[in-house]
Amino acid sequence: MTIRHLSETIINQIAAGEVIERPASVIKELVENAIDAGATRIEVVTAGGGKTLLRVTDNGSGIPADELALAVSRHCTSKLTDDVHDIRALGFRGEALPSIGSVSKLTLKSRPQDADSGFEVCVTGGHLDGPRPTALNRGTIVEVRDLFYATPARLKFMKTDRAEATAITDVVKRIGIAFPHIRFSLAGTDRTPFEMPATGTGAKATLERIGQVLGREFGENALAIDAERDGVRLAGFVGIPSFNRGNALHQFAYVNGRPVRDKQIFGALRGAYSDVIARDRHPVAVLFLTLDPALVDVNVHPAKADVRFRDPGLVRGLIVGAIKQALAQSGIRPATSGAEAMLQAFRAEGFGAQQSAPRPANSYSPASWRTAPPAPRSEWSPQTAHPAHRPLDLQAAPALRENGQAVLGDVAVPAADARASVAEAPVELMQKPLGAARAQIHENYIVAQTEDSLVIVDQHAAHERLVYEALKNALHARPIAGQMLLIPEIVDLPEEDAQRLAGHAETLARFGLGVEQFGPGAIAVRETPAMLGEMNVQQLIRDLADEIAEHDTADGLKAMLHHVAATMACHGSVRSGRRLKPEEMNALLRDMEATPGSGTCNHGRPTYIELKLTDIERLFGRR
């Protein structure tokens, strides 16, 4: 076969196959161009899921008439000169418009801010017509009709009109979060009109824009993030652990304002929440990374969806550290969705619709809501109604010991705060975040009262988190005990992996794993963590080598140790079915208030829910 040059049309169609996957890809490119042009209003109109019509209108700087033909030519751009590593615009390759024009019927109309009239060019299947004068307000309109008409095979891979319209909406929302000062609107015959009014600049405006996309509930359950390390700044908002979702669709990441789906960023996000949410749940987060363009390569993916950091370990450490710090400092804060779910459950059961029944003799009256409850028949006498806090009478679990020896040494199980005064009244306790314990129901749930809410605590889940945090603190406070192997295990690795792993020998030794290089392509394992018991050493070393090669960290071993600690905590916690004394219940509440991450157990389930008095009044039809 003869080698020959491809035609310009075929070249553009090949490029379109890389850049333009679906109608949403077209909208992404056109909206980014509008943002680069300094637009403050961007309107998107679609029909037929974008396959029939796509139109983007903006009030940006516009394109001069003599540059319109260049705008639809390959590799013609105003955003890049000679430094491909200093990219500050969303678009820079000059491929979007010619690629779109090669597979559709494209019309480009523009009028610069200082021009008296507008001009337009048309591109049909790669063939240019114009420019010619046209009536137009200042700004630019790009209209795309019959997408993929020139490559009908691509239409077979399109989804339904509704699915494509939804994808377009998602793209506009994702871009819009990063630019709250721009007003976005979507309309068309295939959708319900949607608008995101401009909210301004700054963190407050960004949170308001995020609320337009994710709903007001996110703002009520969000923690602000703002950290910087070695010239890389991380800002944004993350949800508290109990505010999570069943998929990762509500995770947004931006690098220098560019929406990305980078596995390193989202991997770090998962790592930051690994201890506080269940494995099958996903945190809600909006993260903005700002750094020197020379420190990140955005030219590694045709659609610029992925990036490559010069120092991925720095970025991962910044994300994990900043989020963990924010979670630790958030204190006691339940998700607002928990109370709403409870109210919905009551409504679903018809609660409140039944005829009022006679009030039992021992029930509370409205006037008694903020007063001490009557003493039960057992364990609560007038002398113990307002006790001092005393330590929980709990022993370390059998799982903490092996052959009579403490695996982690003398790890103290969280105890109550014994500093509370004997004279401390329930009124003072009710001012605390989790309030004063009022009762224990079904020997598993603690009912507490604050000044304006009712709190229900799962005693096993709560104490499990307290014990787990104590064990983790013990792990980090001193080196982990190791057990020597009678015969060292030799693990064959690629030479580079072996060298990298040996370079982390000191860090691994703190976790009870003794390794040293054994020749150019092998690692000798002489000691393993005692608390892990029997293990697959070969698989562990290979997993660590892969992790160090990718992230330059050995967090996998730490995660394994934490998993064992979580199992110990589960078995070493106060069990369901155990009756607690009032002082023990109050002690548990105080320890929860002082422990980071106590809103969820080790498995990610909530340890407590809170019903505001206003919620209860709504439940009974008082609001």
Swiss-Prot record:
Biased composition regions of type Polar residues, renumbered to the chain: 353-368
One Pfam family from the record: MutL_C
GO cellular component: mismatch repair complex
Region (Disordered), start-end ranges: 353-389
UniProt keyword annotations, A-Z: DNA damage, DNA repair
Biological-process GO terms, alphabetical: mismatch repair
MF term (GO), any: ATP binding
Function (record text): This protein is involved in the repair of mismatches in DNA. It is required for dam-dependent methyl-directed DNA mismatch repair. May act as a 'molecular matchmaker', a protein that promotes the formation of a stable complex between two or more DNA-binding proteins in an ATP-dependent manner without itself being part of a final effector complex.
Family membership noted in the UniProt record: Belongs to the DNA mismatch repair MutL/HexB family.
The protein's name in its UniProt record: DNA mismatch repair protein MutL
The organism of origin for this protein: Brucella canis (strain ATCC 23365 / NCTC 10854 / RM-666)
